[in-house]
Amino acid sequence: MKVLALRHSVAQVYADTQTYIHDDSKDEYENAFLISNLTTHNILYLNYSFKTLKILNKSGIAAIEVQSPDELFALIRCNFTYDYENNIVYLHDYSYYTNNEIRTDQYWITKTDIINYLLPGWKLTHVGYNGKNTRGHYNFSFICQNAATDDDIIIEYIYSNELDFQNFLLRKIKERMTTSLPIARLSNRVFRDKLFPSIVNIHKKVINVGPRNESMFTFLNFPTIKQFSNGAYIVKHTIKLKQEKWLGKRISQFDIGQYKNMLNVVTTIYYYYNLYYSKPVIYMLGSAPSYWIYDIKQYSDFTFETWDPLDTPYSTIHHKELFFDKDINKLKDNSVLYIDIRTDRGNMDWKEWRKIVEQQTVNNLNIAYKYLSTGKAKVCCVKLTAMDLELPITAKLLHHPTTEIRSEFYAILDVWDIITIKRFIPKGVFYAFINNVTTENVFIQPPFKLKMSPTDYIVALYALSNDFNSRQDIINLINKQKQSLITVRINNTFKDEPKVSFKNIYDWTFLPTDFELKDSVITSYDGCLGMFGLSISLSPKPTGNNHLFIINGTDKYYKLDQYANHTGISRRSHQIRFSESATSYSGYIFRDLSNNNFNLIGTNVENSVSGHVYNALIYYRYNYAFDLKRWIYLHSIGKVAVEGGRYYEHAPIELIYACRSAKEFAILQDDLTVLRYANEIERYINKVYSITYADDPNYFIGIKFNSIPYEYDVKVPHLTLGVLFISDNMVHNVITVLKKMKTELFKMEISTSYTYMLSDNTYVANVSGVLSTYFKLYNMFYRNHVTFGQSRMFIPHITLSFSNKQTVRIESTKLRINSIYLRKIKGETVFDMSE
């Protein structure tokens, strides 16, 4: 959903668009709630309130003030991520395909021959980080840039087994044009760029679990963040390999040597970060042309000092000369060294060239060892070739993708590697490594152990759900870790599957009820975005690869109506009820009937079940941005702080009724996941509320009326407004509550319209207009520790006779209250009050 705020209506009609005019009779929160439950994707919000826009954005719903037709057209035709704190719109708009254009935010790609393999007549455009270079295209009242690129296609091609780039590109563009937008993946970079600066500013020690190549630039500015990944491929792992020969397989039609070098250096930087937690100087030997340095400098400020007889245009200091052993003393501490020296073959005989390459490999290693043998805080990444060679058993081997699989690979060495045991590795084993292993991640840090880290802030985005982790260990970590942002795969299956497949692995699935948390928020991706200054125009698909975002130790926990709130809670219900259901009242009718309340007169006004909890359960796949457990818990302890809106405090029994309705709904729909979720939420309600039932009551509250429009043969026809189980010394507490509620009780608009047999030999009249007051009374008694109400549904009625009678229907008739009293069952009246 996107909300576009306009001062004036527009003449043009847009598909999937609805207009909402600000209702001045309601406050900003109520307007935000009403907007969020509209069913179209685009909302044109007229006569808007800035406060309402802010509320929507904090809820994760993109809401933007629009001041021109161009702005409206740009925003209504695509999806976007909105940085509402800095008023920046990041479009995810691929309409540039109509210019016969693909886009990249990586400069090095523009220096390759990729143009020869594009679709006929197409071009490649460099748009900068997150499309920053496109800002000049939009002369808007807000900062706007198009973050959409085709880098995902290019990178997927590089790692694929396909060689024909044009066919690959064509297929992927057609897929993009015929499938829903993977909005979470597209906006994730924007999210990470907001998330980590805010966390690092607050927390001294931050752990990040499971980063992938998509984050390779994000963390360059954060050397103190400790990364955990899948570990490195080290020399001693080669013992499992059988010897092979030179393969000579082409991987990419266009030259990706630049990409390989960038990945090698970035891998080395992050390896250095995990050892020394600071930024190094980067030395490079055999550097030309290294156009990718430009890419790194767009993200983070590094000093690159390079040696090569050819130009390296983007290095900080360039020595246009060869590097020799005698120059090693020029390399200072707190640095990384990238050695990429190899003579081009040219027209040289391959045997002669092979000898030169092997000698250069030995020389490269000697430079690496000498560099590491003196000084401190150093890491080296060195180019090697497949040959009989001794290497430290702990050396880290790299084989990032390059244009052709030939004989080259790389090793990362640190100061400890050079003093460890070396192992002789035959040439054939190195060929086996080169032919079969591709380094898929620039993060080669060790795996994360699922243990609490009390002084650290843990971030684990899409990293822990894999089934090679113990499910219970994941739960324990989340329950015990005081400060963290951790995601787990949500169970949005219909058969309550404990795990689901993802690519070539399996993920555990989770529901919010799997966790025992306090001071934590459990929400969706868009709900989490709202907590970090972002909002989004499109929620993830309800049955997609979605995750729960669990934020432990947040200062936003008690801001119940601002973050992870109830906005959008009824949206799916509205979509169903106003389109395909038997009546728009279907939800109200079902909730009452499933709790054996058959008086459906005014059911949409006077419903006996919490619609919030019911919708949050049966449509949780759509609205799990709403943190239901937090909402229940804060109500249970009486710490619901709200800024505005039409606030109604539910009685705990209303929540129980909602769970019962949701369970029956789940059974009818054969939705085993909702069935379990509703059962567990009901248990949670009973856990956090101290609910007691007057199933064996000794007192009741009665209401006597001036007159009853039916014949009766009971002594005093009355409405029982609830039964109690109390000791005699608690009578005073009950009377005190009744006196406090006196005005509200006598203001009830009570009416009746028919009679019926409640049970065999019990003939009663229906009563409408008391439920909302009954639940308020229930809450007051609950807060005063008075046992009020039974476990079965409260169905207001007036007993007329204890014999069988025929049903009578009359026009709805108001009943005027004569008195309200407290009476002991089979005893005397102990309190009576009149208006």
Curated annotation (Swiss-Prot):
GO MF annotations, alphabetized: GTP binding; hydrolase activity; mRNA 5'-cap (guanine-N7-)-methyltransferase activity; mRNA guanylyltransferase activity; RNA binding
Sorted alphabetically, which keywords does the UniProt record give? Answer: GTP-binding, Host-virus interaction, Hydrolase, Inhibition of host innate immune response by virus, Methyltransferase, mRNA capping, mRNA processing, Multifunctional enzyme, Nucleotide-binding, Nucleotidyltransferase, RNA-binding, S-adenosyl-L-methionine, Transferase, Viral immunoevasion, Virion
Subcellular location(s) per record: Virion
Q: Where is this region: N7-methyltransferase activity?
A: 171-245, 429-555
Q: What EC number(s) is this enzyme filed under?
A: 3.1.4.-, 2.7.7.50, 2.1.1.56
Entries under CDD domains matching the protein: capping_2-OMTase_Rotavirus
Q: Got any disulfides in this one, which pairs?
A: none
Top-level taxon in the UniProt lineage: Viruses
| tRNA processing found in the keyword field | no
Annotated GO biological process: symbiont-mediated suppression of host innate immune response; viral process
Q: Which PROSITE patterns match?
A: SAM_MT56_VP3
Q: Name one GO cellular component term.
A: viral nucleocapsid
InterPro entries in the record, alphabetically?
A: VP3_Rotav (IPR011181)
Q: From the UniProt record, list the reaction(s) this protein catalyses.
A: a 5'-end diphospho-ribonucleoside in mRNA + GTP + H(+) = a 5'-end (5'-triphosphoguanosine)-ribonucleoside in mRNA + diphosphate; a 5'-end (5'-triphosphoguanosine)-ribonucleoside in mRNA + S-adenosyl-L-methionine = a 5'-end (N(7)-methyl 5'-triphosphoguanosine)-ribonucleoside in mRNA + S-adenosyl-L-homocysteine; 5'-triphosphoadenylyl-(2'->5')-adenylyl-(2'->5')-adenosine + 2 H2O = 2 AMP + ATP + 2 H(+)
Q: What is its main location?
A: virion
Instruction: List the Pfam families.
Output: Rotavirus_VP3
**Region of interest (2'-5'-phosphodiesterase activity), residue spans:** 693-835
Spell out the residue ranges making up region: 2'-O-methyltransferase activity. Answer: 246-428
Q: Where is this region: GTase/RTPase activity?
A: 556-692
Q: Where, by residue number, is the active site?
A: H718, T720, H797, T799
UniProt family annotation: Belongs to the rotavirus VP3 family.
Q: What is known of its domains?
A: Contains a bipartite N7-methyltransferase domain, a 2'-O-methyltransferase domain and a GTase/RTPase domain. The C-terminus contains a phosphodiesterase domain that degrades the 5'-triphosphorylated, 2'-5' linked adenylate oligomers produced by the host cell in response to IFN stimulation.
What is the purpose of this protein? Multifunctional enzyme involved in mRNA capping. Catalyzes the formation of the 5' cap structure on the viral plus-strand transcripts. Specifically binds to GTP and displays guanylyltransferase and methyltransferase activities. Has affinity for ssRNA but not for dsRNA. Capping activity is non-specific and caps RNAs that initiate with either a G or an A residue. Together with VP1 polymerase, forms a VP1-VP3 complex positioned near the channels situated at each of the five-fold vertices of the core.
> What quaternary structure, including any partners, is listed in this protein's UniProt entry?
Interacts with VP1. Interacts with VP2.
What is the designated name of this protein? Protein VP3
